[in-house]
Amino acid sequence: MALDNGTTTVTASASVLGGVGKVLGDAVIAFNKANVVAPLVLSKTGVTGAKTVEFADWKVAASSDVGAATEATDETAQQIDTTARTATLSEHVIQVDVSDLAEQGYGADGGGLGANAGAVIGNALSAKLDADLVALFAPGSLTNDACGAGTALAVAHVFDCLRVLHSNQAPAPLNLVLGLQQMWGAKGLQTLIQGAAAPTGTNLFGHNQAGSDLANTGFVTKFAGFDVYTTPEIAEDGSNDEGGCAFSAGAFGYATGAKGVMSIETQRDASKRLTEYIGTGVWGETMVKDLWAVSLTSDVS
């Protein structure tokens, strides 16, 4: 997607090593490293003059929609309904002020405060986009919900997600995005795999690749047919639950502005002897195809 630095004003006294170009570059790097969910869903770029972007939700066609044709005869047309899903663009802003005195105190040889502003801004905007996307996972917002509030996660719940997605013809790759406690907590996926270390006739997970990966790296990248991800933006709620989700890429989508997802401008405030770094993210998110997602809410403590 396009990343634009907007209209920037950089004076000799306001600039940092490398100028605003370096600040934007650092922000882009931080954004791409920190973002988890956005690469897993659909994305579109809006057009100039429009504040909304539409995604098409196509009805899933079944084998029963395909007829056995007779030679040289017309087949009856099948009605395949579509629904427009709208993402409304809005601004998300973070401002970082760096005073001249603070900048001088930390130096401008690559370790200055201004030189690091881009990374701070990129991380914050990335986290906000993830937070907005995982809000779409909320229990009750989707037709299908495995496990459920107040219920501890079990392997059967993960496979139930797989069953539902396959029954609704959700295309691969399939993603499983969990909160940190859903992954590593006492009632999380890690505990389920670790608890299977002594295999029985019905419990062999601890001695397969998932158990080996967990022991060696502390993480599982593949489990039960899913690519596994975690994000701190899935937070424990007041009922001690976290709301993860199993989904195909077409389940959710987000749109960015015509100039890109992120811009950075600098503005000099001479009377205060500081430089303002303003990062703006422009996006809107929406559920696209409800049947290609399963909310996976579970008790974590």
Task: Indicate residue ranges for each PLM-predicted region.
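N-terminal "assembly arms/tails" that initiate or stabilize quaternary assembly
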Residues: 1-85, 291-293, 298-299
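Signature of extracytoplasmic/envelope-associated structural regions
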Residues: 2-15, 19-20, 27, 64-66, ...
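Glycine-rich, charged/polar anion/phosphate-binding loops
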Residues: 38-40, 159-164, 213-215, 260-264, ...
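Long, contiguous amphipathic alpha-helices that act as assembly "spine/axial" helices in icosahedral shell
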Residues: 55-58, 81-145, 166-178, 228, ...
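Short helix/loop capping segments that flank catalytic or ligand/cofactor-binding pockets
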Residues: 63-66, 97, 106, 185-189, ...
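Extended, solvent-exposed, turn-rich assembly/linker loops in the middle of proteins
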Residues: 138-219
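Glycine/small-residue-rich hydrophobic helix-like segments
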Residues: 217-266
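C-terminal appended segment following the main domain
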Residues: 250-301
